[in-house]
Amino acid sequence: MLQRSPRAGPSRAQGRREAAETGGPTTQEGVACGVHQLATLLMELDSEDEASRLLAADALYRLGRLEETHKALLVALSRRPQAAPVLARLALLQLRRGFFYDANQLVKKLVQSGDTACLQPTLDVFCHEDRQLLQGHCHARALAILRARPGGADGRVHTKEAIAYLSLAIFAAGSQASESLLARARCYGFLGQKKTAMFDFNTVLRAEPGNVQALCGRALVHLALDQLQEAVDDIVSALKLGPGTVVPELRSLKPEAQALITQGLYSHCRALLSQLPDTGAPLEDKDTQGLLAVGEALIKIDSGQPHWHLLLADILMAQGSYEEAGTHLEKALHRAPTSEAARARLGLLQLKKGDVPGAARDLQSLAEVDAPDLSCLLHLLEASERQSLAQAAAQEAGTLLDAGQPRQALGYCSLSVLASGSSACHLRLRATCLAELQEFGRALRDLDHVLQEALGDGDLPRRAEDFCRQGRLLLSLGDEAAAAGAFAQALKLAPSLAQNSLCRQPGRAPTARMFLLRGQCCLEEQRHAEAWTAVESGLLVDPDHRGLKRLKARIRREASSGCWLQ
């Protein structure tokens, strides 16, 4: 009957309901009088009944008779000096009366007792203002303990004591305990009780989803639990809301933890930038808010890291703020003058100004060093800009190849491939360049991509030449069997063109000999159809080759009963 509703700040409907249930001040005073009379009668029947004594004290408190309440509680305390329900009531009462030293001693005894089960029903009796006094006192006491906390094992003892005070403050505050919950969560984190700390941070965030300190705290707990992605997500959310709070928090971390978080934030932004629509259109403000917050925070944490300046430059370019991006690129180049990544970004800015050859010159330096980074940069361009860039790069590559400079041409070749979206003509150009550099494996991979494309009606001659190139590369790698297969495909698609190409390289006699060896091998393994194909292909190259003619006759004899020759 004496307990307050635990709800703080009731709505109008709730207020009407509570008024109906408890009545106005006069009704409440009448209830308290009745409770006091009943408790007094119970004490007369049983003088040892402590519950009745506490009930009487609570009724006196509700009636505003604080001196009598104090006396009644002192009697109860004399009977049970360590009783938590009595200590809690006396502490609240002494705070209300202004006797802070006595209140502090009582709270200290209550903390030492470790009995908190009684607190909620006890505190429900007291008015909101008195509960606030207890919360403020306990919270301040906990902070004082933490400020004076020594190192080592004694520090853990002090932290546990602070947790006890904070728990009292949380009980007293009810739903308005965010500061105490945050402080207690940090204490649990200090003690290594990560999941308990997480519980307190989550409690705060359920009530205040935008609490920046709680987001930061929970992020650090996630980090301690090896949940890097969750930690990064919380930090990003916090940075959107209050970067001024987050940055000092991150700068205070140990180097190892700070490196994990900053690298995670960097990777997060890079992943988002790589997912941009492939249109080159500037991002809207809502899309760049989080990216900008992270980019600016990384520079505030460590302005000497060139990668952070490059990231912010990319974000600004994605937003369309090219002049501001140029400022950060100059800072990155000042710290790393030979950075291909920074020069490539300057090239992108040149392209935006219309200098396509200059852009190609700066961008090609990154093509062979960090192709994924260059691909992300090219996402920031419009389709027409990428097309112009691919053409300019291919033209310069062709000039360098004609001049006998394949090493200098390679970057331009790779730039043309990336800017064109791996167009077949640019892949062929790079394969030629790589072959001159004797990087046969890479050249072969480029041709494989070309050969995987769908074949148009008028593309047979070109496809035949691609197979001839593939075969030559396979020969350079020592795979004669696969080379023979590629040459056979070319002869099947365009016999005349393939004959002329193979007679030039590797030459009529070497090609015929290769088909002869291939046919003999297939025949020994009883693969008659493949042997026949090899012989027929070889005779297309050299119709008068005696060895191929003899092998053809032998295949006929051995398979005279089969129908596979038809």
UniProtKB/Swiss-Prot annotation:
Keyword annotations of the record: Repeat, TPR repeat
Superkingdom: Eukaryota
Ranges: TPR repeats: 50-83, 178-211, 212-245, 306-339, 341-373, 424-457, 464-497, 512-545
Alphabetized Gene3D superfamilies for the sequence: Tetratricopeptide repeat domain
Region ranges (Disordered): 1-29
Pfam families reported for this sequence: TPR_16, TPR_8
UniProt cross-references to InterPro entries, sorted A to Z: TPR-like_helical_dom_sf, TPR_rpt, TTC34
PANTHER family the UniProt entry points to: TETRATRICOPEPTIDE REPEAT PROTEIN 34 (PTHR44874:SF1)
Protein name: Tetratricopeptide repeat protein 34
Phylogenetic lineage: Eukaryota, Metazoa, Chordata, Craniata, Vertebrata
